[in-house]
């Protein structure tokens, strides 16, 4: 029986002429385990829906732009379309309308497992449907069958200096995979633009399948003296194969990776990595080049390095106060950090105004599997004392923890202690969201991105300011 689901979604507009409404949707998921065939049925309907929507409301304003927005990283400007996820300031991320707790409940799991399989989330992101277990199993097998790396990429990875940052190695390897791009080949042969999405889909599926192999090879070469990663097991899921290739056999760690790869997969379209993939893809660059560009953005300290900064700060606190520090001593350390002009890493978010649900689900995992771990207990104490202090300070819009306040602690517990590698894990996960979006970018025929820029003099003239 095809899976049916009814849910409500609040649709609001900044324009006063468009009143908020509650709409009820019924989603009938196909029984087919052929993901491309499922998409082939959905895409024409969505193309028609968007066409009609633009025809009727194309000239309708959805927001305003201030001078501060232009100088402030375009924060808050509504300028992108992203179908896969929406970030609610109060509820956190919703993947195709589903919150993280809802995804944990309805997405298929591994036998005996409690966390959702990332394959299921990818199916949800790219189709909008909650998949069946059979569909997820088929996707696991398909990715296993597509996972082999071409020999030139293996040679390249094995000849990179082990001192080269893992993210640089990832970017190089993904760029080199462009040699195998089915989309680039089809484009050069003059394929019709209505077929672009099919080849972007093929490249995206190949890339997602190969990323754990690339990432595991980087890990083994850089931190394990080049020990082989072994072969992909077609009977295992994507995360299980990844952890096995990394060299970890602990089933709890595999469960953690399933959770980690799910919750880091997507976060709307405006963050640096997602926007970069969309931007580069809008020039009709293939998925390999687009994703590599996104990974170069993710490698930046302000985007993908936050959980490392949290760990460094925690280790500093632990070294100074010890494992059993009292709440009062932790409070004193927090105040000392703030008074020195630094921030408390892992707290606050550009959009969220409550505790990040990605933090919450990791905390629940820790409470279940490692409640007595000293580093986790320290994180728990910090969770108690930091929000009231930041609230008292009065300068912070969001005093609550984000995803980065917790992820590094869990990885450390299970023995993956190489902090420079953490962003690679983030990148493997983020592929699920950004590549699902890239397929839809081409399916909807979105044009090359080309916003208008202005000089300071031009802005001053536009607003009537004196120079």
From Swiss-Prot:
It catalyses: oxaloacetate + acetyl-CoA + H2O = citrate + CoA + H(+). The keyword Mitochondrion applies. Its EC number is 2.3.3.16. The keyword Transit peptide applies. GO terms for molecular function: citrate (Si)-synthase activity. Pathway: Carbohydrate metabolism; tricarboxylic acid cycle; isocitrate from oxaloacetate: step 1/2. One of its GO terms (biological process) is carbohydrate metabolic process. It holds the Pfam family Citrate_synt. GO terms for cellular component: mitochondrial matrix. Keywords: Mitochondrion, Transferase, Transit peptide, Tricarboxylic acid cycle. It is found in: Mitochondrion matrix. Its main location: mitochondrion. It comes from the Eukaryota. Gene3D superfamilies: Citrate Synthase, domain 1, Cytochrome P450-Terp, domain 2. The active site is at residues 303, 349, 404. Belongs to the citrate synthase family. Homodimer. Citrate synthase is found in nearly all cells capable of oxidative metabolism. PANTHER family: CITRATE SYNTHASE, CITRATE SYNTHASE, MITOCHONDRIAL. This is Probable citrate synthase 1, mitochondrial.
